[in-house]
Each structure stands twice: as C-alpha cells, then as structure tokens.
Design a protein with these regions (language model features):
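Short hydrophobic alpha-helical segments enriched in small aliphatic residues
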Residues: 5, 19-23
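Zinc-dependent deaminase
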Residues: 26-47, 95, 108-170
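Short beta-strand scaffold segments in enzyme catalytic cores
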Residues: 52-57
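Short beta->alpha transition motifs characteristic of CBS
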Residues: 63-70
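A short, polar/charged loop-to-alpha-helix boundary motif
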Residues: 72-82
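Immediate flanking context of iron-sulfur cluster ligation sites
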Residues: 94-106
Length: 170
C-alpha cells in the first residue's frame, strides 16, 4: 500500500527548512489533509461503516491513512485512528510517533485518544467534535496538555456525512 501522496517529492527536498515550508503552505496543506481525511471517511461510509477517516502526517508528508473497518474486521479495534497508528508505526519502525500530526474526521473516542497519547503524537486536528459531552470530557483528560488538540476545523463536510450515515441507519 502506497501511503505517500504523489507529487510530494518537492516537499521532501524542501523539508530541511520546515519553518518556511509550514509558513508558506500551512493552511493550504491543512485543507489538503482534510480532503484526504474526508476521502477516507467516504470510504467508510460506502462500506457501511461509521464514516471516520484518519491520516498521519510527518514533515508535511502523509505517512498513513485509514478509515473505520470495525464491521469488515469484526473487531472493536477497527477504528480509523488505531489502524493509521499501526501503519505509521510500521513505516517508521517505531511506536513513538513524535513529530507526527493526526487529522481525523471526528474527535477520537477515549480508546483512540489513549492510543494517540501513548504514541506521543504532536498534534490532533479534528474536522468535527463529538456530540457526546461525557466522552469529550474523558478525551480532554486523556490527551496530554503538550499535545495540540483542535476540533471543528472542517465541520460542514464531516457532520453532513455523519448525519447522512445515521439517517440511513434509522
């Protein structure tokens, strides 16, 4: 499985000066990342899974991507975040994903938040926040203060996809 985005070779060469790359392309890249996350969430939706997509980025390069596969795998561990963490760890040869940022279509559940915390990711960026306030409070306690954690960064697309999924289930 190819995890790097095609056409990112120029970025890899430019990453020696990460500050300038982030300064020049930061907002543009975040939009591109959420486009990939949304694509992954759509894959889950089309497979009859809860539409959650996740990517992991290191040095502005997508190193892992996944979507929910609980039904397909018949496993509670088939969450998009856990699958992406496994792929990123395998690629980097290390379970510590320091310097990595995670982009998710929905706030992580407590189980995934704990895994992200253990992986020592630098930042967690979510398209839409969970509507479960109890779960949100638990997740906020799990994620370390040093980890950047932002939600509601791409609300319209992800919330519409989630609403359509659950509307079709009822």
């Amino acid at each position: 499985m190819k995890v790097f985005e095609s056409g990112q070779d120029w970025k890899i060469a430019a990453l020696r000066n990460h500050f300038h790359v982030h300064f020049l392309f930061g907002d543009y890249m975040k939009k591109k990342y959420f486009d990939i996350v949304y694509e992954q969430a759509n894959r889950a939706f089309n497979a009859g899974e809860i539409p959650v997509g996740c990517i992991i980025v290191k040095n502005n390069v997508v190193i892992a991507r996944s979507h929910n596969k609980r039904e397909k795998m018949n496993s509670v561990l088939g969450h998009a975040e856990l699958l992406a963490l496994q792929d990123a760890s395998k690629l980097l040869g290390n379970w510590r994903l320091e310097g990595c940022d995670v982009y998710i279509s929905l706030d992580p559940c407590p189980m995934c938040a704990a895994a992200l915390s253990q992986a020592r990711v630098r930042g967690i960026y979510c398209a839409v926040s969970s509507t479960n306030n109890d779960e949100k409070a638990i997740v906020n306690k799990i994620i370390p203060k040093k980890t950047k954690f932002l939600s509601d960064l791409d609300v319209e697309r992800s919330s519409t996809l989630l609403k359509n999924f659950f509307k079709n289930k009822r």
